[in-house]
Amino acid sequence: MQDAITAVINASDVQGKYLDSSALDRLKSYFQSGELRVRAAATISANSALIVKEAVAKSLLYSDITRPGGNMYTTRRYAACIRDLEYYLRYATYAMLAGDTSILDERVLNGLKETYNSLGVPIGATVQAIQAIKEVTASLVGPDAGREMGVYLDYISSGLS
C-alpha cells in the first residue's frame, strides 16, 4: 500500500530529481485535505453498519436479487453480500486516508471481477450497492468529504465494471 506522499516522492526519486512545483502542489493539497479525510474516516468508522444497512435498503433489499431464486436469497448469500459491502467501505476509507488507490488494487480488485463472474455474483447489483454506499456516506460526512470518498468508491465500481 502506498500513500499520496510516497507516490509523489517515488515519482521524483525514480527520475533522480528534487520535487518540482507540481509534486509540491500535490503534497500541499494532500496535507490541506488531511483533517477533512480524518474526520470523514471517523464518521464512517462510527457509522459503518448503518451505512451498509441503508445502502442495502436503497439498492438491493426489495429487488429480484433477494427473492427466491435470486443471488442473495439464502441467508448465507445475503450475509456474504453484506460482508463484501463492508469490506469495500473499509478499504475505500483506507484509500481515502492514504490519498491513493493502490490498496484497492492490491486487496480488493485483484481478481475480484473474475471471482464474482465464476460464482455468478451479479456485478451490476454490486456496483449499484457500492453507489448507494457512496450516497449514504456523503449524506453523513458532508459534500466535500463525500466527494473525496466517492473517488475511491467509484474506483471500486469501475474496477468491477
Swiss-Prot record:
Q: Name one GO cellular component term.
A: plasma membrane-derived thylakoid membrane
How is it modified post-translationally? Answer: Contains one covalently linked phycocyanobilin chromophore.
Query: Which Gene Ontology terms describe the biological processes this protein takes part in?
Result: photosynthesis
- Has UniProt tagged this entry with the keyword Thylakoid? yes
CDD domains to which the protein is assigned, alphabetical:
APC_beta (cd12126)
Modified residue N4-methylasparagine is at which positions?
A: 71
Q: Which cysteines are joined by disulfide bonds?
A: none
Which membrane topology describes this protein? Peripheral membrane protein
Q: What is its main location?
A: membrane
Protein's cellular compartments: Cellular thylakoid membrane
Q: Which Gene3D superfamilies match?
A: Phycocyanins
| Keyword terms | Antenna complex, Bile pigment, Chromophore, Electron transport, Membrane, Methylation, Photosynthesis, Phycobilisome, Thylakoid, Transport
By sequence similarity, the record places it as follows: Belongs to the phycobiliprotein family.
Q: What does this protein do?
A: Light-harvesting photosynthetic bile pigment-protein from the phycobiliprotein complex. Allophycocyanin has a maximum absorption at approximately 650 nanometers.
Quaternary structure per UniProt? Heterodimer of an alpha and a beta chain.
Task: Provide the protein name.
Answer: Allophycocyanin beta chain
Q: What taxonomic classification does the UniProt entry list for its organism?
A: Bacteria, Bacillati, Cyanobacteriota, Cyanophyceae, Synechococcales
Q: Which gene encodes it?
A: apcB
